Amino acid sequence: MRLRVRKASQQRSATPSARTVKTKRKHSEVEHSLSTEDAKMQKRDTGIFSTIKRFIRGNAVKVEQCTPAKRSRVDCDSDSNLITSTPTGGNLPSRANPKTRRKGPVNGDTMTGQNKPVKPNGKLEVQAETPSSPPRTTLLGTIFSPVFSFFSPANKNATAGSDSPGQAVEAEEIVKQLDMEQLEETPTSTTTDGRDLTFDPALNPRPLPHIDTTVEEGEIVTEADMPPLTAVGSNSNYPDVPPSPPAEGTYEEDWEVFDPYFFIKHVPPLTEEQLTRKPALPLKTRSTPEFSLVLDLDETLVHCSLNELEDAALTFPVLFQDVIYQVYVRLRPFFREFLERMSQIYEIILFTASKKVYADKLLNILDPKKQLVRHRLFREHCVCVQGNYIKDLNILGRDLSKTVIIDNSPQAFAYQLSNGIPIESWFVDKNDNELLKLVPFLEKLVELNEDVRPYIRERFRLHDLLPPD
C-alpha cells in the first residue's frame, strides 16, 4: 500500500509539474508573440488594434535621458593690447595681431576655441579680432616704463596712496608698436648664455674720444682737480662738459603735453605707510662703495622697442601674459664705459618703472655677473600716485646725503628733487655723449665726501624750474 501510494503521489506530482512547464512554455510563447505583435504594432502607428492596445495598456511613459548640451567654446578673439595700457575701443576697426602667438589660457582668460590654421612654415595664422573682445590688461599693464599723466582736478588733494590705474597714459611709441609684423619663431628659454641673443658685431663699444674741453667759470669741477679717467681698455679721457638746462624757449615745445615740473609741484606727499616701507636692498658690506648712484633704464641707458630695429645691438624674447615678444635693444653711446668707471666709486643701483620680466632679463644679458650693477629695483618698488610711478629713494635704505639718481624723467624723483640729475632722453643719436658729460661732476662729488644735495641743487637748479605758487 505504501509503495503504491508513493508511486501514485509521484505520478500525481509529476503531472502538475509537466503542466507547469507547459504553462510556462505557453506563457513565454505568448510573451514572445505579444512582443512580436508589439513590435509590429509599433511599426504601424495607425489602425484599430493599436488604438485598442493603447486604450487597454495605456501609453508607455517615455523616459528621456537628460544629457547635457554639447559644449562649445565661445569664439572670443585675442586682444592685441597685451603690453599697452590703452585698450582698443569697440568702435575701432578690427585687425589681426600677427606678431603674437598663444601658448594657452592663463588666469581664466578666454581664447578662441577654433583651431587656428597652421601655415606651411609652422606658424600660426591668427584670425582677425572682434571689437567686442574684452581687454586682458589694465591700464598699467605695460612692460616698458609708462608715461606720466597729470593729476585729475578732482583728485588734486589726494594722497600718494590713492592711485588710480585709469589715469595712466601709455607712451605713444608703445601704442605704435601694435602695428607689428609676423613674429618669428623664438625660443622661450630665459637663459642668458647668449643662445637666444643676436648681437651686431658692428655695434661694439667704441673707444672714448679725446676731446679738449674748457672749464666754464663757476663750476665746481676743474680739469686740474679731476683724476685721469680711463675706461677699461681705453686710454681716452672723459670731457668735462657740463649739461646745460633746457632753454625756456624750447621747453614748451619739448613738453607740449606733460610738464614734469608742474607735476612735481603738485605731487601729493607720501603717506605714513609709504614713509615706513621696509628697505628693498640688503645692508652694505665693507666692499660696497660709500656713495650710491641710482640709474634709470629706458631712454637713459638703453632704448628698447618691439618694432624691428636694424641697428639694434641685441635682441631677445620676452614672455609676457602668455605671449612672446621680441625686444630690440639699442645701447646708449658710452653706456658700458660709463658703468665700468662709475661702478668703481659708486654702488650702482638700477631703478626702473618697467616690468621685471623685461628689465631683469635685459640686465642679465648686459651684466650677467652683476659686476657693474649691484642691485635692481623694478616697477613694484615704485610708489604709484594716481597711476603714475614715482621712485621714492627711501626704499633703498641708503643715506640720501650720499645718494644720486640719474633719470631722463625728472618727475620720477619728484620726492627727492635735490638728489636728482636730469639727462636728455636718448633714442637713436649715435653722437650722443650725455653720459660722458656727467662723469666729472659725479667723480667730484665722491672726492668732496660731503652731502651731495647742495651741489646737485646748485648745479642743475631744478627747483628754479618749478612753477610759482
Swiss-Prot record:
It is an enzyme of class 3 (hydrolase). Keywords: Hydrolase, Protein phosphatase. Pfam families: NIF (PF03031). Residues 1-42, 73-136, 181-209, 231-250 are annotated as: Disordered. Residues 286-445 form the FCP1 homology domain. The keyword Isomerase does not apply. InterPro entries: Dullard_phosphatase, FCP1_dom, HAD-like_sf, HAD_sf, TIM50. SUPFAM superfamilies: HAD-like. One of its GO terms (molecular function) is phosphoprotein phosphatase activity. Residues 28-42 have a biased composition (Basic and acidic residues). Residues 10-20, 79-91 have a biased composition (Polar residues). Coiled coil: none annotated. Its EC number is 3.1.3.-. CDD domains: HAD_FCP1-like. PROSITE patterns: FCP1. NCBIfam families: HIF-SF_euk. Belongs to the CTDSPL2 family. Probable phosphatase. This is CTD small phosphatase-like protein 2-A. It comes from Danio rerio. The lineage of its organism: Eukaryota, Metazoa, Chordata, Craniata, Vertebrata.
